Amino acid sequence: RRHWTNVLTRYTVGVGGAAVIGAITLIFAYLLWVVAPILLPAEIAAPTEYRVVERPAALVDVSENGEAMVRISETGIVEFFSVADGSGIAAYDLGSTIVKAKRLSPLVDTYALLDNNNNLLFVKTDYIVDFDGGQRRLSPKLSFPFSNRSIPLGPLDNFDVQLADDDLVIATVRGSQVSLTRFKNVEIGYRLSGSAQVTLASTVQAQEVFLGPRNQWIYLLSKSGEIDVLGIKSLQRVSRLYQGSLAPKGSTITAVTPVLGRYSLLTANDQGDIVQWGALVNANETRFVALRSFDVEQSVAQLITEPRRKGFLSVANDGELSLLYPTSGRLLDQRPSNLPASAPMAISPRSNLLIAAPNDGLITAHSLDNKHPEISWSALWTEVWYEGYEEPIFSWQSSSADNDFEPKFSLTPLAFGTMKAAFYALLFAVPIALMGAIYTAYFMAPAMRALVKPGIEIMAALPTVILGFLGGLWLAPIIEANLSSVLSIFVFLPLLLFAFALAWSLLPEKIVHSTSGWYGLIVTPLILGSVYLAFQFGPFFENTFFGGNSRAWFLEVLGLSYDQRNALVVGIIMGLAVIPTIFSIAEDAVYAVPTHLVRGSLALGATPWQTLVKVVLLTASPGIFSAVMIGMGRAVGETMIVLMATGNTPLMDFNIFEGMRTFAANIAVELPESEVDSSHYRILFLAALVLFLFTFVLNTVAEVVRQRLRRRYGSL
């Protein structure tokens, strides 16, 4: 019977251990499986060609769902084709000759068409899905969003048009003359009315004109790279914001286009350089700085931007296609092609298809596999120069209310916040837990130990959400209102304890020995008294040393700003959560030191303190080290306390009076709201993988060190 019991126990333990290892392996495999797609390279696929009716194209585009293509020809014919086989679906005749066509930014289904009489007409495409005999059918429709009346513009060299909220602006340029027409309270389906017009003189002979963000700026550029930026928030008070050059001396601008949101411009020159220029606006001036550059090694003839992301595609003079993304600074893929450099092209709204009309009777489609262009090693871990910022920064900001928002996916602030929270928690917890464990196991009276040890261990059962709640809503306001008093505790407590210890040593030997092991209970009133004195004298210290306002003093003298929910609160509250773990393991390690070692040391003449330092702590060092490492793992992975007791702001500042955002808290907050399989979703899983690997490596190193300590001191 004993044999079968041993066999059953052995296999049960073995299966349990294998299950734990298997679970850890599965967790790692699943995290890696979710993260893996962001490591795959982007690709421009080989083209698919469609033979269609020969007509010169002014514009080509793709429907939202990628099932239909539209070609607006110079003869005024609007045709729809199937992406699957290139077959014609529908056609409409506008009855006019089109010389130039553009998307009505930021819409992806509305276009501004300029005819040969310089009249501007807006058209809108709709795709209706119905079922005929059980078969799905796509029916394209062409409509006029602002009525079928065209808008006369007069002589012009180029134009741009943009709809921002309910504000429609049309800008035309002819030489150095700029004309602006603004329509207010614009709604799709209603006729345009109530226009305001103004004509301005520019300082450059502009060949390109682009409206800026929210129709508040206008960019005017010449072929030589000269730029004139005007503020047009009010047509009655137009101001010049910037005047300068966006091209190296001796070079010529060959292509220019705004990036989504229009806070920056992309320029390509005849030397093969593509530069992203960002506008920096402050109260005193507006500047344009080169945020980043790309070298495609040959002259670029055309730049095609993505409708809903910051990415773009360049077309070289020999037809080579280059797929790039500014934020990550990556040249994603290149592919040679036979496309004419000036052929009308467009990237689909979902950025998965490139459509081109290389000649009158042909349409080509390149499939784009480019799901995560914003992710790169540099974008995740190094400083990135984002639009509108004075310099490269570390930043995590995954979402915004604006569709033209530039996501910021730097993991560095989250890693920094994780280490910051763990550091301050351990700074508070480790000394208290270890000293308490050593005293409880070695010096404390057995009767008192029987009460103290279970009492501290039961603290581990407290839900961290309760601790976080208390920290954020109770402790944080108290510390904010009594900062000087809280800091005074760290002065009063050690001074009073030292004075008490000195006085206690002067008492008769009989009293000292009779109370041995009960010192923890004896000094408890002293500890409470020191806290009381600190709060009583806190205002005095604040007036004497901090000029009556400690928070203002820290900011003005030390440059440390103060937030109510900060690392100090996290250190205290998370320390309370970590202390039971460290205390319990360390106390068991110290208490388990064989008594014959202690008695032998004392018998050889060592004092109890010498025995503790030279024998007990060395023998217990593997367990003490394990306690600290397990406590650190608990602090690194803590979620609810950090989430509730800090501002949860991803800062790169070690200031104890400011908060942070950690990996765990960030995952808890953002994962439920992220779109499945999006870049944001996969980066959150990458953060989980980084946290998993960190704790795995930490525990592995801790185990190696523990084993070495055990071999070294186990023979004492």
Predicted regions: what they are:
Residues 3-7, 11, 38-72, 76, ...:
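Periplasmic/extracellular loop-to-transmembrane helix junction in inner-membrane transport proteins
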Residues 75-81, 117-124, 175-184, 224-231, ...:
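Structural motif
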Residues 408-422, 476-495, 511-581:
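Loop-to-helix entry region at the N-terminal start of transmembrane alpha-helices
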Residues 425-456, 500-507, 702-711:
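Transmembrane-helix boundary motif in ABC transporter permease subunits
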Residues 499-508, 587, 591, 595, ...:
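C-terminal transmembrane helix and the adjacent membrane-cytosol boundary/short C-terminal tail
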Residues 556-560, 642-692:
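Interhelical loop and adjacent transmembrane-helix boundary motif
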Residues 583-585, 593, 608-643:
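Transmembrane alpha-helices
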